[in-house]
Amino acid sequence: MTYDGELDIAIGLSARSKVWSNKRLKWSELVSRLGEENKTTETFKEFVSASKEDQLKIKDVGGYVGGYLRGGKRSPANVVHRQLMTLDLDFAHKDLWDDFTLQFDNAAVLHGTHKHSDASPRYRLIMPLSREVTADEYVAISRKIAGIIGIDLFDNSTFETNRLMFWPSTPKDMDYYFKVQDGPWIDADEILNSYADWKDSSLWPTASSRFE
C-alpha cells in the first residue's frame, strides 16, 4: 500500500460495551482487518426473516468507532476527533464501486454489510481523512462526500459522529463483497473549503423528503 498512515479508532467487544478501547493503528492494518471474511451460522434467508432484535444479535461480532473517545465512552459529547469516515449506503446499486472510483481517486474501502445481496446491495464506505477533524467538521465533510456520490443512497443516521460500525460479517451462504482503492487520504480542508461557509449547516447536503 502506497498511501498509509496512522489513525485512531475505538474498539468495542459488542454494541452493548460500556467502555471502548482507543487504539492507534495503521490504515493498512485496518484494511487487512476489514478484509477478513467472517461467516455467521445462519443463512441469508434466515437472517432477513429474523426479528430486528435477533438480526442485531447475529451481526454483533464487535465493532468500532472511527475516532478517539474520551474515557472510552461512546457518546457524541465524548468524540474528541474523527479521522476515519464510515458511512452506510442502504439504498445502493450494484455499480456503486465503479461509479465511486470514477469520482474519487482517494484511499477507500467498500464492503458489503450483513444484509447485502446482489438483489439489494448494501455497502459500508470507509475513507481515511488527511487530518483529525472535530465532530462538526466530520459531519460537514461526510455529508459533502455523500452529496457527491448521491446522498439518497445513504442511511440518514449514518453521519452521527459516535456511530458504531460492526466488523464485517456475512451469512454462511453468502459471499463477502470487499473492494479497496489505494490513494491519497481525502483532504479534509479541501472539502470544507468547497462550502461557502462549512459551519452553516443549512448548506450541508441532506436527503430528499422521501428519505427523511
For each feature predicted by the language model, list its residue ranges.
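Catalytic "initiation/cleavage/transfer" segments centered on a nucleophilic residue
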Residues: 2-8, 12-40, 48, 131, ...
